[in-house]
Amino acid sequence: MKPALLEVMRMNRICRMVLATCLGSFILVIFYFQSMLHPVMRRNPFGVDICCRKGSRSPLQELYNPIQLELSNTAVLHQMRRDQVTDTCRANSATSRKRRVLTPNDLKHLVVDEDHELIYCYVPKVACTNWKRLMMVLTGRGKYSDPMEIPANEAHVSANLKTLNQYSIPEINHRLKSYMKFLFVREPFERLVSAYRNKFTQKYNISFHKRYGTKIIKRQRKNATQEALRKGDDVKFEEFVAYLIDPHTQREEPFNEHWQTVYSLCHPCHIHYDLVGKYETLEEDSNYVLQLAGVGSYLKFPTYAKSTRTTDEMTTEFFQNISSEHQTQLYEVYKLDFLMFNYSVPSYLKLE
């Protein structure tokens, strides 16, 4: 083959390679600009396409600066609840602000969802299992889809949710200022009876019987048997109440979270909560939170009938055998919760 022909063939091959390289580069440039103009879509846990959160309205904006000019009845209701907390804190400032500065340990009940800019203070015996399930769905990045598929014991594993005390002080302050903060409350004595029934009348709660039952029986029961002192599994409600109002109890250690006051768990006189949900309107209030977070179209609060739920009628029965003196002392322990969340004094109480 002649040298001139070989040279022509070699040049053609080089030209084709250069053309292919240029074409590939051009395609990459086009793809880059398209990605800049159209952000990559991600899928929420239920398979609904939603764009990245950046640029959308935050829950705080949805709550305090709604698109519609006229506030809804729900928004007005929650404003009244916020005002009730503020007024109670102001009226009881000497009691409610004994501690001016919170420590990180005070924030361990505040669960953080960075994706949706939410902070939830969980209160045991106020639907906290289902709300922890919801927070796991919201923060799970696709790991979970149906809240009710998450086992109850898994919802209470601390490693599954991030709490505010795990952040630095500047990060804590930023989130308290920028995120929507909410909690759920319940009539204080109904919550207390619910805690007693769950922790002291169920045979499987051996750890509570050993940890608290034995101590309560030793302190409150005269002529207790050795078996009762050893097992602690037959604590009477009257003994439980006597333990709670005993001044020595909280001097020894703080109340367990299941019967600790909401005021002490969530510090509403130090932290401004944007929403106060109530157990009595649980489904409605929960779905309002989800709506403000921008997930209400595909995520709802789980509903199911629980036949073992503690009711007002049950609570009335439990308090029948409590003396008026002990009822009065117990009310003083939970008084701030009654006032702050606008619960009236129960009609069954015989206060001195």
UniProtKB/Swiss-Prot annotation:
Pfam families registered for this protein in UniProt: Sulfotransfer_2 (PF03567)
Transmembrane segments: 17-37
GO molecular function: chondroitin 4-sulfotransferase activity; dermatan 4-sulfotransferase activity; N-acetylgalactosamine 4-sulfate 6-O-sulfotransferase activity; sulfotransferase activity
Enzyme superclass (EC): transferase
Posttranslational mods: N-glycosylated; required for activity and stability.
Source lineage: Eukaryota, Metazoa, Chordata, Craniata, Vertebrata
Keywords, comma-separated and alphabetical: Carbohydrate metabolism, Chromosomal rearrangement, Disease variant, Dwarfism, Glycoprotein, Golgi apparatus, Membrane, Signal-anchor, Transferase, Transmembrane, Transmembrane helix
Gene source species: Homo sapiens (Human)
Gene (UniProt): CHST11
Resulting phenotype, N223S: Induces a weak decrease in enzyme activity but has no effect on stability of the protein. Unstable protein
Effect of N205S: Induces a weak decrease in enzyme activity but has no effect on stability of the protein. Unstable protein
GO BP annotations, alphabetical order: apoptotic process; carbohydrate biosynthetic process; chondrocyte development; chondroitin sulfate proteoglycan biosynthetic process; developmental growth; embryonic digit morphogenesis; embryonic viscerocranium morphogenesis; in utero embryonic development
PANTHER family reported for this sequence: CARBOHYDRATE SULFOTRANSFERASE, CARBOHYDRATE SULFOTRANSFERASE 11
Tissue spec. comment: Widely expressed. Highly expressed in spleen, thymus, bone marrow, peripheral blood leukocytes, lymph node, heart, brain, lung and placenta.
Topology versus the membrane: Single-pass type II membrane protein
GO cellular component, one term: Golgi membrane
Catalytic reaction annotation: chondroitin beta-D-glucuronate + n 3'-phosphoadenylyl sulfate = chondroitin 4'-sulfate + n adenosine 3',5'-bisphosphate + n H(+)
Name this protein carries in UniProt: Carbohydrate sulfotransferase 11
Similarity section: Belongs to the sulfotransferase 2 family.
Keyword Magnesium part of the UniProt annotation: no
Disulphide linkage map: none
Superkingdom of source: Eukaryota
Subcellular location(s) per record: Golgi apparatus membrane
Function comment: Catalyzes the transfer of sulfate to position 4 of the N-acetylgalactosamine (GalNAc) residue of chondroitin. Chondroitin sulfate constitutes the predominant proteoglycan present in cartilage and is distributed on the surfaces of many cells and extracellular matrices. Can also sulfate Gal residues in desulfated dermatan sulfate. Preferentially sulfates in GlcA->GalNAc unit than in IdoA->GalNAc unit. Does not form 4, 6-di-O-sulfated GalNAc when chondroitin sulfate C is used as an acceptor.
Disease note: A chromosomal aberration involving CHST11 is found in B-cell chronic lymphocytic leukemias. Translocation t(12;14)(q23;q32) with IgH.
Lumenal side: 38-352
InterPro entries: Carb_sulfotrans_8-10, Sulfotransferase
Positions glycosylated per UniProt: N205, N223, N321, N342
